[in-house]
Each structure stands twice: as structure tokens, then as C-alpha cells.
């Protein structure tokens, strides 16, 4: 108060007032403070001060032609005086208003294209539904999540090249667009952004949002796909949650989801084949997800899931160093151990050989519905702090931790024999045997574990053997916490190796993953998964096997035709015929195979009986090990649609129907492709078959006498030449071969040579 009074007194004296209001500021320190550097020191003040002036804006001289000097109200929009120190014009804020109302308009067509991610977000929110708000304790755990819906999965470098190519196509600098997705995106964007007037830098920023996955390590309770993360601030607080259903899906979430399903299916299928690793690679390379090659997606997509990581390891890609056990991701946070083989006895006196981890270690365990911190010593659980969504999830985590601890009381709790097998009917390793056993029934395990009184610790509570919470007692060493355990945040990737049984190890030889860890959960993929590998045909049931087998034969008919005549045994052993065998009734397989093979042999031996359609139709039946019998069949049975359906040996049936007019084959009513019979198979086909064993030398040569009919040919001696009458009354010169070995190629060359000789 005192100082204000003093100031008032001072201001009342006109000389002081003059000094305070008119004198220039010439104190060096003050001048320095406000003038050094480009950074504005007091932007708010500067803005107020500028806007209080009549002409706070400067503009290019051209503005004088584009804007009138005065607006409709007669207010001046720009001053004729030049801006000091530049040749720009001083402009009033009113000019901006005039420009916005009356200035030129530009096309808005590119805005939705450039700001695509925002426009799509608005649509999702518009169509999303927000449900009620619930107040309850939120168990949030930090997970690495995708915060940018609707992106492609390019690496930063790949995206940079695409952006440079699209936005600054004429800039110098080496840009190599290699991947399929890079090329597709570049082409698409160049077309979309033709004649785009939006500032290139803006376009570049927005393209980056569209092309690159951005992840953050955020506390989440609930959905982790990017369409949930974009509304995280609306759906979960510290003590509340709001139900939300997104108003649309985005491709990146669909890719992640479909990739997991494809990888699980492939790993499960590979496990049961003779060489799992080779099969897995073959399937990964021949599978497409939403029209993009699975191997390209695996290289770019950071999804961490057991099956996906096994596929990545097989391709030689780096994966996370954490390991998986019982569906939980374990990350060692401190301590170390050495491994030693040890024999232990179960409660049923069965001997198990387990690899014991000797030493003190601490782990974080993260699962879909529960998380935990585990401290253990050699074959002893010291402490487990677990949190989860519900009783069931907490129990799952406790079982996994108890088995992982390798404690004796756990092994002694086994009742009955352990003989669990995997899909390929091989016994599981001892640790997974124990896990499966207790996952089925953990009552004895929990009863035998032992309980202890507990101290009252904030946020912690005990849990009894029947999985009910308790404040005084708890299972030995085990506590339930309100707080979740964060997922391992590091994105570090390590080099791993994989053996032919798909066990993935780090460089120290620790097993990180194995097919036993792959979830059995079935889901429906959001994007179309196309498995081109014959190993995956059975995934969609018997009909798919049938259609795929015939489609494969038709696609490869040229190669098959040659093998059919030259090396049938090799053809019958092709793995593409394996799935088909499961459709043929077990009792009939060998008989059918013997019958068809004999029939084919007759076709090879007896002239004029080569029949493309029949060979294609019966070929899959010849793949089973044959039984030599004299049995004849007029139809062969396949088990589809829940019952036996017949394939007629001669003629069409609902299973196999060839339309001669359209030259198309339908299998169970589905189109299986177009089939070109050997040209004019009725005649030329017969001739090419007949002329096997004969070399066509060219046009008719009168020196070799009158033309013989095809039937008279059989009387020629080896090496003898003759004219022969074929098809439409044309005559060609042939010679009977001296050796039988080359007979096989004749059918193919005969047709071509007949044409050449005639023309």
C-alpha cells in the first residue's frame, strides 16, 4: 500500500511523470534481456502490444492488388507507408477478416486425403458408442501400445524414402524403394496428391502418421488395440472406467490380429509334419494376409506373441529376449542361475529329469489377464506378488509360478502318471508335463503348498488354497496386490537360434519359446489369410482340401503331365496329395490306389487312351500306397459334407464336373479352373499317343510307299520309316524308334511336329 501511495505522489508531479512515461529504456541489462536471441521472451505481452497497433502485420506488396484499400465499412485495410527496413506493406488485422470472407477459395479435395488419419478418427468417434461409467479400482499395467490407428507398417527409413519420393520427387538423393508395400503406397499417394496445393511439409508430416507405427509405453487396463488407445483418456481414469465400442476398425489392428492367427495355425500345423522347421518356413513364404506376403509383414510388424516370434526366429529375425512359459512372458530383472539336470520323483513315483535353475533370480511375469513379480532361489519360491482381473486369472498365474519354481512339494503333488503329448504325439518335456497336469486340476497342489500368517501391508492381501482372499492368512510366499506389474518396456531385440522342432534359444542356450507355448485359442481372422501351401488346405475342412487339390493339379498340369508319363512314382509321392488321403475311406485307400495306378499304366501302354480329364480326376487317389488286386471300380468314394460322395471313374458327378463346352472344371460346385485338353483329344490326342515310339520326320515322302493307316503302323520294325495318314487326311513321314527309352517325350513333341509337318 505504502509503495502505491508513493508512486501516486510521484506521478502527480508533472516532471516525474514525464520521465517515467517518455524516457527511453537505456539500461543495458534490460535491453540485453529483451533483445538477445531470436526467442520471444514475453510472447503474450508482445502479441497484445502488436495487436494494439493499427498495422501489426506485414505483407508482400502484391497484397495491394489483391485487397482493396478500404473495406465495406470504410476502414483502412493497409497503409501506403512501407514497413521500416523491408519493402513490405503494413497491414491491418481487418485485412485478414476481409480475406477470409472475400478472398479466393481453393479446392478442398486434398484435405481429407492428406489429413486422412484425422478424418478417419472423427468417423470412428462419430460411430463409436460410449457406455456407462463404472467406478472401481483400475488395475493398470504399462504396456507398449500402438497409438496411431490406420498406419501402414513401414520402418522409419522406408517411410522416409516414400515421403521424399511422393512430396519432393525432384530432390536429389538416393532413394531405393524395394518392398512391395513401399511401391504400392508411393504409386497410390502420387495419384491421390496430384495438383495438391497443401504445404509440402504438412503433407510430409501427415504421410509419416500414415506410414509408421508409433508406440508408447502407457498404463492400460483393457483393450490394447490402437482404436482403444486413441480414446484412452476417455475410457479409463484412476478409479473409473467408461465402456466404449469403437465405431470402426483400422487395418493395422486387423493385420496384427490376423498375423497372430496365421502364425498360430502355421506353427500348429508345422509341429505335426516330418520336418517342422522346413514346413514352417515353406508355409510362411507361401501365405498372404490381406493380400500382402506374410514374410513382409513379419519383417515389419513388431507384434510380440509366441507363434509370431517362432515364425520370426525361423526367418532369422531378432526377437525380444524375454521367454515364455505357461502363456506368461517372463523377464528376468535381477540375479542369475546355472542349469543342472536333476532327477526327481513325483507323488506317483514317476522319475522326471528336469533342468534345475540354481541361484537367486527375480522375474516379472506378464499375461493377458494377470501379472506378477516372482522371487525364487534354487527349487524354492521365495515370494510371488500377483494381481489379476479375477480369481481364475490369479489362479492361472499362481500355478505357472509354482511349477516354474520347481519346488519339491509341487512335484510331490502330482497324482497319477504324466503322459501328455503334443499334436505330433510326442511326449512333452517334464516342465510342460507338470504344467498341463496342474492346469487340469491344482487342488492337491494348493492344499500341499502350505499357508502362513501375513503382515498387514498396504495394497496387499492374502489368498487361501481355495483361491478366496483373506486378510490374516495366505499361501506360503504368495500375496495378491491391487497394483499390476508393468510389461517389460524395452524394445531391445536379440539374435536367436531355432532347431528343427521349433525350439527357440538365445545365445546362451536358454529356451525362450517352443510350440508348447503357442496358444490353442481359435479366432476368426479379420483379414483374408490365403495359405497357398498344401499343408494348410485342411484348415478349412474337407471341401477345401478337395478343391485345392484339383486346383493345384490344374495349375501345374504341364509339369504333372510329363511326370505322369515319365516318372509316375515320383508324382504319386508329392506332398500335395497328402491332405487328400484323409478324405478317402481308410479301408478303400490301398485298393483305390492299386486300381487307379493299373488304369494309368494301361493308358500309357494302350495307344489312344490318354484322357486328360480322367487322369486329373483320378490322380489324387493314386497317391496312397497301393494294394495289387484285381478289383475294378466304377466310382470312388470321398468323405465330404459329412457323408461319402462318389467320384465316377467315367463321367461327371457333383464332386468332379468337367464342362466340355466351357472347358471349366467345377469341384463340389466351386470353380477349380480351366482345363485345356490336349488339342482335339479325340483324334490328335489319340495320334500323339499312337505316335509314341515314332519319330516324326516331316512331310510325306513318296519313296516310302503309300500312306499306312494308324493301325498298320504296329507292323514296322525298329528304325523303319513309313508315311502315315493322320487326323484330317494329312500324311506325315515317321520312323519307328530304335530305343524305347525316348518314347515318353513323344506324346508332347508329336502334336507339335504333326502341326509343323502339315503346315
From Swiss-Prot:
A single GO CC term for this protein reads:
virion component
Give the keywords, sorted.
Cap snatching, Eukaryotic host gene expression shutoff by virus, Eukaryotic host transcription shutoff by virus, Host gene expression shutoff by virus, Host nucleus, Host-virus interaction, Inhibition of host RNA polymerase II by virus, mRNA capping, mRNA processing, Viral transcription, Virion
Q: Which InterPro entries is this protein grouped with? A: Flu_PB2_2nd, Flu_PB2_6th, Flu_PB2_C, Flu_PB2_CAP-bd, Flu_PB2_middle, Flu_PB2_N, INV_PB2, PB2_helical
Please tell me which stretches of this chain the record labels as motif Nuclear localization signal: 736-739
- Give the GO biological process terms: 7-methylguanosine mRNA capping; cap snatching; DNA-templated transcription; symbiont-mediated suppression of host gene expression; symbiont-mediated suppression of host mRNA transcription via inhibition of RNA polymerase II activity; viral RNA genome replication
Stretches that traverse the bilayer? none
For the site labelled Avian adaptation, the residues are 627
Give the location in the cell. Answer: Virion; Host nucleus
- State what this protein does: Plays an essential role in transcription initiation and cap-stealing mechanism, in which cellular capped pre-mRNAs are used to generate primers for viral transcription. Recognizes and binds the 7-methylguanosine-containing cap of the target pre-RNA which is subsequently cleaved after 10-13 nucleotides by the viral protein PA. Plays a role in the initiation of the viral genome replication and modulates the activity of the ribonucleoprotein (RNP) complex.
UniProt-listed HAMAP family: INV_PB2
Which family is annotated? Belongs to the influenza viruses PB2 family.
Q: What name is this protein filed under? A: Polymerase basic protein 2
Q: Which species?
A: Influenza A virus (strain A/Gull/Astrakhan/227/1984 H13N6)
